[in-house]
Amino acid sequence: MPATLLRAVARSHHILSKAHQCRRIGHLMLKPLKEFENTTCSTLTIRQSLDLFLPDKTASGLNKSQILEMNQKKSDTSMLSPLNAARCQDEKAHLPTMKSFGTHRRVTHKPNLLGSKWFIKILKRHFSSVSTETFVPKQDFPQVKRPLKASRTRQPSRTNLPVLSVNEDLMHCTAFATADEYHLGNLSQDLASHGYVEVTSLPRDAANILVMGVENSAKEGDPGTIFFFREGAAVFWNVKDKTMKHVMKVLEKHEIQPYEIALVHWENEELNYIKIEGQSKLHRGEIKLNSELDLDDAILEKFAFSNALCLSVKLAIWEASLDKFIESIQSIPEALKAGKKVKLSHEEVMQKIGELFALRHRINLSSDFLITPDFYWDRENLEGLYDKTCQFLSIGRRVKVMNEKLQHCMELTDLMRNHLNEKRALRLEWMIVILITIEVMFELGRVFF
């Protein structure tokens, strides 16, 4: 009996394994049939939509080139308008259907997949003329913002200077402010040792100036001249660039509190001048010097123009210093507006106030920005040249603007100082309250205990 059961179980297992193998074979045979059916349907659909000629049999008598030629003729006559219409829709290319051609064909032949390679080449040929721009979507690249360029300190002589005509006799006058002060005595000896000649024919009331002559000038129309002001400015008239660099190098040894080199070359003034017949004047940003004057009178007129240029470059340096100071306290109003705590000590606030007072003292008390120098009181012609140049350089307006900025900065620093004083007073009051509380507690302890 057990042997019979074992044989029945083995036979049933063999039957089940055979059935499973038959099922797998049937599934594998159906898969190629489905793929063949899908390929046939897709081929018929594309063939109907494109209206292409495909051979039914390989032995139809047509070779590869003839089939390509027939399909090309069909595409030329029937594919042009639908493709053009398709390209105009949403910037995307769509395959034209039979409805777009306005015709309905009935397929009467069976598909032949032997020409599939020819069919792929025909598709490539028909769509080779379609622009690739219709398939690639437009990309919106973000615009990169360029960093804004730092604004130059206001120089009216540069911004309002008209375009000058080209003139071979045109010469240049350049002014620099390099330090707070010069040692004119030592500078005179040092320049004389380098071959420069000092001009000693100046009036007695022009004591704070040094005038040096240059042998080789930039142009032959006027001798090269350099004016050194004790206030720390130098003005070059008709001097070569090479000579100018040499003088600036010698000047570094005799400077008191020199400025930054980049700031010196950035904040400068340059005017063109020319020799004419007639009275000297400043016309449309160009200095016109009288060619009939002798050397001493020509030096005095150049001194009047140079004095105004000296004030302009010194004021430009102080404008840059004030702008730097404003940037250092720019975060204070923003912090007060946002209700944040301002991290400034009492010593730092007093230092800021000292910087403001020093700058204000230089502009209003230690310079000739507010009044005309005494040198021009009995020289009306030179005073006219000086005032005209100062007006062209907008010195009065710039000084007024600087004083307004200084006043605003003073109000801000006073606010910070009062705020710190109030904090200190409040701290002292709390200390007094705490001490009184401790004393009261001691008294209460002595009474009750």
UniProtKB/Swiss-Prot annotation:
Example of a GO cellular component annotation carried by this entry: mitochondrion
Protein biosynthesis keyword on record: yes
InterPro entries: DUF155 (IPR003734), RMD1/Sad1-interacting (IPR051624)
Keyword ATP-binding listed: no
GO biological process: positive regulation of mitochondrial translation; translation
Keyword list, A-Z: Disease variant, Mitochondrion, Primary mitochondrial disease, Protein biosynthesis, Transit peptide
Pfam families: DUF155 (PF02582)
Subcellular location: Mitochondrion
Transit peptide location: 1-12
Source organism superkingdom: Eukaryota
Primary location class: mitochondrion
Disease linkage: Combined oxidative phosphorylation deficiency 11: A severe, multisystemic, autosomal recessive, disorder characterized by deficiencies of multiple mitochondrial respiratory enzymes leading to neonatal hypotonia and lactic acidosis. Affected individuals may have respiratory insufficiency, foot deformities, or seizures.
Functional description taken from the UniProt entry: Required for mitochondrial translation, possibly by coordinating the assembly or maintenance of the mitochondrial ribosome.
Family: Belongs to the RMD1/sif2 family.
Subunit structure comment from the entry: Homooligomer.
PANTHER family: REQUIRED FOR MEIOTIC NUCLEAR DIVISION PROTEIN 1 HOMOLOG (PTHR16255:SF1)
Protein name: Required for meiotic nuclear division protein 1 homolog
Gene name linked to the record: RMND1
